[in-house]
């Protein structure tokens, strides 16, 4: 087992990474202070790992209940969030009840938001079961739900007590979900660590094959990078926005097609191709680096051309973005691997990128 710490003073927490961690009672025990636990999971993950988690919690002598949500990005909304609150209120959960998010990014984001809101804040633990959630969404305290007009526009910054990333859970992940997680790994290397990007290029096939050593390193290094960014800028006042490389275009794709049509990581992968193209057009990135970025995204079996939503629709959707200011779209662009710039771009350059990178 590897442990990475997120240094946030009195709200610091560990990220435990390894195989077989869902069943290890001792990893949960220090973070559960009250008399009850509510597991929040979904219809796909509960049959796979729910019993193992409940067995791990049993020796703690707590009252354990489970809320099972429908599976998918399409359900990341108020209606599904209320199912969590319904369960908590029905079970008479109190301020010391610990929520445990067992699932991917949708489960983790909604459980964290419910924890932030219920009785104005109860503790929660992240147990991410997808590669995307292990390398990205479970770390850093971003929680929330989608709105029909924009992704993740309603939410809160609320840190977990711990993240327990069991890479053994990745063996049951569908291929599309695995590729979606690799997209976030690629993003992390591209924005923050040129050496890690080199490693990803050399090991993308090992990740595709789910080789445990490659997966463990990808999760560890991604978490180290994200932990250091979050520690420096917890509430995305500046530096943390670099983690949104590929997300301005990507979120537009998700909202434009309808949530769940493309996986989040698929949209981010394509969004990085689009952001790379725009980076070259603005004279920030060299063509050879753009080609390397496109090649590794394609090697991860991610889409490299976006849907033809139309220029006007893309622009409208990208204005509904947390980085936008006074309606002006801001993009995270690459200068070189490991070095980014957050900037506006002329409409003509964006239109040229859309013409080049959409169907």
UniProtKB/Swiss-Prot annotation:
It catalyses: 7-phospho-2-dehydro-3-deoxy-D-arabino-heptonate = 3-dehydroquinate + phosphate. Keywords: Amino-acid biosynthesis, Aromatic amino acid biosynthesis, Cobalt, Cytoplasm, Lyase, Metal-binding, NAD, Nucleotide-binding, Zinc. InterPro entries: Dehydroquinate_synthase, DHQ_synth_AroB, DHQ_synth_fam, DHQS/DOIS_N, DHQS_C. Pfam families: DHQ_synthase, DHQS_C. Its main location: cytoplasm. It comes from the Bacteria. Disulfide bonds: none annotated. NAD(+) binds at residues 71-76, 105-109, 129-130, 142, 151. Its EC number is 4.2.3.4. One of its GO terms (cellular component) is cytoplasm. Zn(2+) binds at residues 184, 247, 264. One of its GO terms (molecular function) is 3-dehydroquinate synthase activity. Pathway: Metabolic intermediate biosynthesis; chorismate biosynthesis; chorismate from D-erythrose 4-phosphate and phosphoenolpyruvate: step 2/7. Binds 1 divalent metal cation per subunit. Can use either Co(2+) or Zn(2+). Its cofactor is Co(2+); Zn(2+); NAD(+). Catalyzes the conversion of 3-deoxy-D-arabino-heptulosonate 7-phosphate (DAHP) to dehydroquinate (DHQ). Belongs to the sugar phosphate cyclases superfamily. Dehydroquinate synthase family. PANTHER family: 3-DEHYDROQUINATE SYNTHASE (PTHR43622), 3-DEHYDROQUINATE SYNTHASE, CHLOROPLASTIC (PTHR43622:SF7). This is 3-dehydroquinate synthase. The gene is aroB.
């Amino acid at each position: 087992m590897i442990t990475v710490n997120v240094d946030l003073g009195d709200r610091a927490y560990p990220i435990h990474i390894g195989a077989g961690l869902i069943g290890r009672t001792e990893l949960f025990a220090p973070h559960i202070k009250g008399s009850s636990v509510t597991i929040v999971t979904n219809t796909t993950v509960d049959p796979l790992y729910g019993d193992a988690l409940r067995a791990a919690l049993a020796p703690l002598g707590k009252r354990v209940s489970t809320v099972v949500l429908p599976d998918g990005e399409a359900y990341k909304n108020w209606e599904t969030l209320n199912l969590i609150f319904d369960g908590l209120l029905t079970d008479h959960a109190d301020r010391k009840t610990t929520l445990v998010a067992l699932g991917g990014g949708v489960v983790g984001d909604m459980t964290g938001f419910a924890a932030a809101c219920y009785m104005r804040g109860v503790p929660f633990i992240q147990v991410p079961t997808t590669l995307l959630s292990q390398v990205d969404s479970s770390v850093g305290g971003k929680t929330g739900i989608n709105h029909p007009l924009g992704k993740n526009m309603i939410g809160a910054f609320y840190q977990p007590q711990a993240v327990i990333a069991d890479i053994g859970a990745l063996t049951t992940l569908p291929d599309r979900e695995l590729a979606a997680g690799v997209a976030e790994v690629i993003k992390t290397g591209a924005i923050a660590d040129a050496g890690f990007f080199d490693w990803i290029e050399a090991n993308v096939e090992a990740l595709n094959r789910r080789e445990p050593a490659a997966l463990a390193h990808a999760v560890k290094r991604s978490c180290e990078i994200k932990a250091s960014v979050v520690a420096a800028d917890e509430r995305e006042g500046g530096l943390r926005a670099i983690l949104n490389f590929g997300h301005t275009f990507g979120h537009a794709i998700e909202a434009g097609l309808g949530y769940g049509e493309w996986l989040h990581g698929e949209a981010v992968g394509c969004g990085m191709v689009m952001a790379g193209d725009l980076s070259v057009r603005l004279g920030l990135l060299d063509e050879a680096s753009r080609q390397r970025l496109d090649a590794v995204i394609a090697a991860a079996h991610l889409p490299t051309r976006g849907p033809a939503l139309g220029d006007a629709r893309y622009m409208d959707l990208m204005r509904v973005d947390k980085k936008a200011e006074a309606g002006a779209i801001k993009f995270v662009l690459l200068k070189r691997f490991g070095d980014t710039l957050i900037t506006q771009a002329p409409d003509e350059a964006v239109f040229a990128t859309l013409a080049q990178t959409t169907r």
